[in-house]
């Protein structure tokens, strides 16, 4: 079904079964597969491929060369009825690739709202991305990666499968992210090590100086204490019940995960 207000270049191929919403714009030489849903006001520039069981949210804009909704690159996957869901008002720049999920792991790759994907970034199968995230050029997310709201990943950084990146974390360019990154953490290097807190991001998010000071103290207690990271975090939790960002860090550490925790020290992982 194609809405009457949609504007589609005659050189583009729209397969039967595709749903094209109101005021959608599709430029030249695009391919839209039969199981694709483009919500209202989506804009697709030239030479874009959207295939698979893919839904693109209202107002999202996709630039030339992007391939959205291709099968998982997992060697053991089954693509039957798997999906990719992209939220509203995302910007997907040149050459970006996003894959559908795998049957074995829930079947869905999910991307939230207001995200920015710069050129040649990659979102693999079964990833879960929140809102207001930035993936800079050539960022690579392996399968099953979780990225929370307002995280920023610098150019060329690579994230190991099943890794979690917490809210408003900052990943430096060319970093290798092999382990979970706490909310508000900054990670740099290869191997990636924590280098402190994303204080600039916390300030921009409206946290006052006293709150940031408490979160810094919490960070030191976690990573400079005598016990393991998880033991240190559990021991101080009651001190921070009234400090939301610190409590978020502590709960992130306590949560079950397939990966260990990034730290400032190569020898401490959990």
UniProtKB/Swiss-Prot annotation:
Keyword Lipid biosynthesis in annotation: yes
GO biological process, one term: lipid A biosynthetic process
A GO molecular function held by the record: acyl-[acyl-carrier-protein]-UDP-N-acetylglucosamine O-acyltransferase activity
Signal peptide: none
CDD domains, alphabetized: LbH_UDP-GlcNAc_AT
Cellular-component GO terms for this entry: cytoplasm; membrane
The keyword Cytoplasm belongs to this UniProt entry's keyword annotation: yes
Sorted UniProt keywords: Acyltransferase, Cytoplasm, Lipid A biosynthesis, Lipid biosynthesis, Lipid metabolism, Repeat, Transferase
Annotated PROSITE patterns: HEXAPEP_TRANSFERASES (PS00101)
Major site of localization recorded for this protein: cytoplasm
Residue stretches in coiled coil: none
Transmembrane segments: none
Top EC class of this enzyme: transferase
Pathway: Glycolipid biosynthesis; lipid IV(A) biosynthesis; lipid IV(A) from (3R)-3-hydroxytetradecanoyl-[acyl-carrier-protein] and UDP-N-acetyl-alpha-D-glucosamine: step 1/6
EC number(s) from the headed UniProt entry: 2.3.1.129
InterPro entries associated with the record: Acetyltransf_C, Acetyltransf_C_sf, Hexapep, Hexapep_transf_CS, Lipid_A_LpxA, Trimer_LpxA-like_sf
Top-rank taxon: Bacteria
Family matches, as SUPFAM superfamilies: Trimeric LpxA-like enzymes
Cellular localisation: Cytoplasm
Catalysed reactions, semicolon-separated: a (3R)-hydroxyacyl-[ACP] + UDP-N-acetyl-alpha-D-glucosamine = a UDP-3-O-[(3R)-3-hydroxyacyl]-N-acetyl-alpha-D-glucosamine + holo-[ACP]
PANTHER family assigned: ACYL-[ACYL-CARRIER-PROTEIN]--UDP-N-ACETYLGLUCOSAMINE O-ACYLTRANSFERASE (PTHR43480), ACYL-[ACYL-CARRIER-PROTEIN]--UDP-N-ACETYLGLUCOSAMINE O-ACYLTRANSFERASE, MITOCHONDRIAL-RELATED (PTHR43480:SF1)
Subunit structure: Homotrimer.
Assigned protein family: Belongs to the transferase hexapeptide repeat family. LpxA subfamily.
Function: Involved in the biosynthesis of lipid A, a phosphorylated glycolipid that anchors the lipopolysaccharide to the outer membrane of the cell.
Family annotation (HAMAP family): LpxA
Protein name as catalogued: Acyl-[acyl-carrier-protein]--UDP-N-acetylglucosamine O-acyltransferase
Organism from which the protein derives: Sinorhizobium medicae (strain WSM419)
């Amino acid at each position: 079904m194609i809405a009457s207000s949609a504007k589609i270049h005659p050189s583009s191929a729209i397969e039967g079964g595709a749903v094209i919403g109101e005021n959608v714009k599709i430029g030249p030489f695009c391919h839209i597969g039969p199981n694709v849903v483009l919500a209202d006001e989506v804009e697709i520039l030239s030479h874009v491929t959207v295939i698979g069981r893919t839904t693109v949210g209202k107002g999202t804009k996709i630039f030339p060369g992007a391939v959205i909704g291709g099968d998982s690159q997992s060697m053991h996957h089954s693509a039957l009825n798997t999906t990719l869901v992209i939220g509203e008002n995302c910007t997907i720049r040149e050459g970006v690739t996003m894959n559908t999920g795998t049957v074995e792991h829930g079947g869905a790759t999910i991307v939230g709202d207001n995200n920015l994907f710069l050129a040649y970034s990659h979102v693999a199968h079964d990833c879960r991305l929140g809102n207001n995230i930035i993936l800079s050029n050539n960022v690579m997310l392996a399968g099953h990666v979780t990225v929370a709201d307002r995280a920023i990943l610098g150019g060329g950084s690579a994230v190991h499968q099943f890794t979690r990146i917490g809210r408003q974390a900052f990943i430096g360019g060319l970093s290798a992210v092999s382990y979970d990154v706490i909310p508000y953490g900054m990670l740099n290097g290869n191997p990636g090590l924590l280098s402190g807190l994303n204080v600039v991001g916390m300030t921009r998010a409206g946290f006052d100086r006293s709150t940031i000071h408490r979160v810094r103290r919490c960070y030191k207690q976690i990573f400079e204490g005598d016990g393991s990271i998880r033991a240190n975090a559990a021991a101080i939790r009651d001190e921070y019940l009234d400090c939301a960002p610190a409590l978020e860090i502590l709960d992130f550490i306590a949560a079950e995960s397939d990966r260990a925790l990034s730290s400032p020290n190569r020898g401490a992982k959990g």
